[in-house]
Every structure is written in C-alpha cells, then in structure tokens.
UniProtKB/Swiss-Prot annotation:
Transmembrane segments: none annotated. It comes from Nitrobacter winogradskyi (strain ATCC 25391 / DSM 10237 / CIP 104748 / NCIMB 11846 / Nb-255). Pathway: Cofactor biosynthesis; coenzyme A biosynthesis; CoA from (R)-pantothenate: step 4/5. Its cofactor is Mg(2+). It is found in: Cytoplasm. It holds the Pfam family CTP_transf_like. GO terms for cellular component: cytoplasm. One of its GO terms (biological process) is coenzyme A biosynthetic process. This is Phosphopantetheine adenylyltransferase. Its main location: cytoplasm. It is an enzyme of class 2 (transferase). The gene is coaD.
Length: 165
C-alpha cells in the first residue's frame, strides 16, 4: 500500500521553510499532495490559483527528483477531510520551535480524534530556515524589502511585482 502524505498550508507565499519541509517529506512517502488552504475570512496576498501555481512550480521538481509522486490541490474544509478525499493517511507539519510544537500538538490531537486513520508527522526545520515565516516575508515585501533570502526566486519575483510601487 503506497504511503500518501498531505502537506497542508496557506502558502501565502511559499517560503524556503515550506521547501525544506517538502524536501524532508518526499523521503517519507510514495506520494505527496500539497494542499493549499482557502479559508473564508482570510484575505491572502495571492489568490488560491496563484498560490497553487507557485507551490506546484516550486515543489514538484523536488518530488520528481526524489522519485515521489506529487500533486497540488486546494481545499476549503477540515484538513482531515481533505486528507480523506485524496487518500492520505499522513499529515506533514513543519516545526520551527517549541511554540510551533505546542500549537501543532493540539491540532494533531484534535485531528486524531476526528480521523484516527490519519497520523501527523512532524518535520523539524533545518537551522537555516527556522526564523522564516510567511507573515514576516509578507511584511518585508510590503515595505519594499528584499525577500530573496527567504523565498524561492519565483516567489521573490512575484512578490516584487505584487508590491512594486
């Protein structure tokens, strides 16, 4: 039975931290599905279609190189429901620090109660990407700062275009 993993997130924007998680995740599964969340009430910088396209462009080559099947989808329901829809039994979550661990453990516990067949796997961030958050990247970009150390080149270019003033 193939190991199918779901890596959910808003990916607004895709960061080098997300890319780090994908590099680890493709070694843990036979098929990785990146799920771009669409949440009512949130106003993302990039549309769901843009985030999906950027995620696919950045992550798919990593999966292909690792010999891992890959797909990218959007979802607007519970993460465990999205996992069930695509046949995933593994949820991949990145951890930067203890604060992330505390938060993610709560979510993992709730998810396991709702879907005992779906297991959360935590991937610790590599040291070079631990300080990166999409929120900080957005703040830097909106103020005209250079985000290229924190995001893939494609994303840096899209952010420059988005916030060119």
């Amino acid at each position: 039975m193939p190991r199918v993993a779901l890596y959910p997130g808003s990916f607004d924007p895709v960061t080098n931290g997300h890319l780090d998680v994908v590099r680890h995740a493709v070694a843990l599964c036979d098929r990785l599905i990146v799920a771009v969340g669409v949440h009512p009430g949130k106003t993302p910088v990039f549309s769901a279609d843009d985030r999906l396209a950027m995620a696919r462009s950045v992550f798919e080559p990593v999966a292909v190189e690792a010999g891992c099947a890959f797909d990218c989808v959007t979802y607007d329901d519970l993460t465990v429901a999205a996992a069930h829809k695509v046949g995933a039994t593994i949820l991949v979550r990145g951890l930067r620090d203890g604060t992330d661990l505390d938060y993610e453990m709560q979510i993992a516990g709730m998810n396991e109660t709702m879907a005992p067949d779906v297991h959360t796997v935590f991937v610790p961030a590599s040291p070079g990407v631990r300080p990166i958050t999409a929120t900080l990247v957005r703040q830097i970009a909106t103020m005209g700062g250079d985000v290229s150390p924190f995001v893939p080149q494609l994303v840096a270019s899209r952010l420059r275009t988005k916030f060119a003033g």
